[in-house]
Amino acid sequence: MQQRRPVRRALLSVSDKAGIVEFAQALSARGVELLSTGGTARLLADKGLPVTEVSDYTGFPEMMDGRVKTLHPKVHGGILGRRGQDDGIMQQHGIAPIDMVVVNLYPFAQTVAREGCSLEDAVENIDIGGPTMVRSAAKNHKDVAIVVKSSDYDAIINEMDANEGSLTLVTRFDLAIKAFEHTAAYDSMIANYFGSMVPAYHGESKEAAGRFPRTLNLNFIKKQDMRYGENSHQQAAFYIEENVKEASVATATQLQGKALSYNNIADTDAALECVKEFNEPACVIVKHANPCGVAVSNSILDAYDRAYKTDPTSAFGGIIAFNRELDAETAQAIISRQFVEVIIAPSASEEALKITAAKQNVRVLTCGQWDTRVAGLDFKRVNGGLLVQDRDLGMVTAGELRVVSKRQPTEQELRDALFCWKVAKFVKSNAIVYAKDNMTIGIGAGQMSRVYSAKIAGIKAGDEGLEVKGSAMASDAFFPFRDGIDAAAAVGITCVIQPGGSIRDDEVIAAADEHGIAMIFTDMRHFRH
């Protein structure tokens, strides 16, 4: 499988010029003839490198403002020509073999992401010659090396040095795979961009057009293979988006512990996204994708202590997320108190890592700090299809709330209501959250009946000896009947926050008034399935 091919002639044409001068210098120093186009050629010439413009090489000028540069038989014949099979026809037409193509494409994604980008701007940043050369070289990888990533430059030079100026078939094949991935992702971006414009071109309303293209092309990069999936009989892998712009489990760095499992990643994502909702030092403990304890306080140590007290039984083997650096004192409290699968935080102190290292199986991840939440898409696979929606980044503020009961909430009740409303957003529907003094005291998750979620939240609080009287209750969706309010009143809830919107809202509000409960409408639902 060695099948080495010497690199004697290379064509370089890049939009992202990072590292290209050094790479070209290294190639030239090893006797490689350099061909290039436009700005790349000028850059290399300015650095004193012996470079031949493609227009001089082909005898055909660049034209149409650079739209036509490399689309010429002398270029593509040199790339596609099969060594040992097409040599005669190449010689007949004066076509020299090109052994390496170094290309990256016009910055289409960056262009369309710019505010005020016009259709004309987008069109002019659709690369034609680049993808054509990339695909030609990748197709003929038995003889030609195609380089689309600057991160490969050093490894290529090292291999050439180790193989007397040649590259192996294994390397050329690997580079070809990267090339096809590169062009597939590029074409997908273009298809998605123009696909989302189709309704507007057909004169349909903006509402009908929405933001979704008529075909959806997704590109993810495999980060790791896994021992198994959600269950041991399922195979699995973890794929991530390229250029993720927000701190996430996908971009987190694992500092210690065993490899993350499928369920670890899903639960860590749930914990991290929940803790992001809070500005104060916060701790979220998750089990099976549901928060089982959440608290905010003046320190993450106290926040952890209070979150743990919500449900110590469920916290065993859970995932713990913080929105502040993991410090030694908090790490010690966790390790001394419970078995934990994963701890994730923006950062971790050296002292904290020394403590967690005593438990080798504990996975510690750092994800960096987050300043803003980035809008994007959520996906849910169904048999034969894919549901797509915007990420649920919605969250009401105190000024947007509507008090619909006779009694107004106290300042403390209002704070508790907003706190448990943030938590309810991340609890599986039907979701009920009891909270008091910035701490969950009972969580009812995933029940088919909302009233049973309310009952479970009360049972959990009672089992842990937590005082419900005077607490706030959040419901992720409206109460269809008054029974949920009656159940809340029976355990001492004094404030309820919910979306509203039921045909029986009047009946539900009347129940709150009967019990002296302050009721707040958010006019925003947070179903989570």
Curated annotation (Swiss-Prot):
Gene3D superfamilies: 3.40.140.20, Methylglyoxal synthase-like domain (3.40.50.1380). GO terms for biological process: 'de novo' IMP biosynthetic process. Its EC number is 2.1.2.3, 3.5.4.10. It catalyses: (6R)-10-formyltetrahydrofolate + 5-amino-1-(5-phospho-beta-D-ribosyl)imidazole-4-carboxamide = 5-formamido-1-(5-phospho-D-ribosyl)imidazole-4-carboxamide + (6S)-5,6,7,8-tetrahydrofolate; IMP + H2O = 5-formamido-1-(5-phospho-D-ribosyl)imidazole-4-carboxamide. It comes from the Bacteria. Residues 1-148 form the MGS-like domain. GO terms for molecular function: IMP cyclohydrolase activity; phosphoribosylaminoimidazolecarboxamide formyltransferase activity. The keyword GTP-binding does not apply. InterPro entries: AICAR_Tfase_dup_dom_sf, Cytidine_deaminase-like, MGS-like_dom, MGS-like_dom_sf, PurH-like. Keywords: Hydrolase, Multifunctional enzyme, Purine biosynthesis, Transferase. GO terms for cellular component: cytosol. Pathway: Purine metabolism; IMP biosynthesis via de novo pathway; 5-formamido-1-(5-phospho-D-ribosyl)imidazole-4-carboxamide from 5-amino-1-(5-phospho-D-ribosyl)imidazole-4-carboxamide (10-formyl THF route): step 1/1; Purine metabolism; IMP biosynthesis via de novo pathway; IMP from 5-formamido-1-(5-phospho-D-ribosyl)imidazole-4-carboxamide: step 1/1. Pfam families: AICARFT_IMPCHas, MGS. Disulfide bonds: none annotated. The IMP cyclohydrolase activity resides in the N-terminal region. Belongs to the PurH family. This is Bifunctional purine biosynthesis protein PurH. The gene is purH.
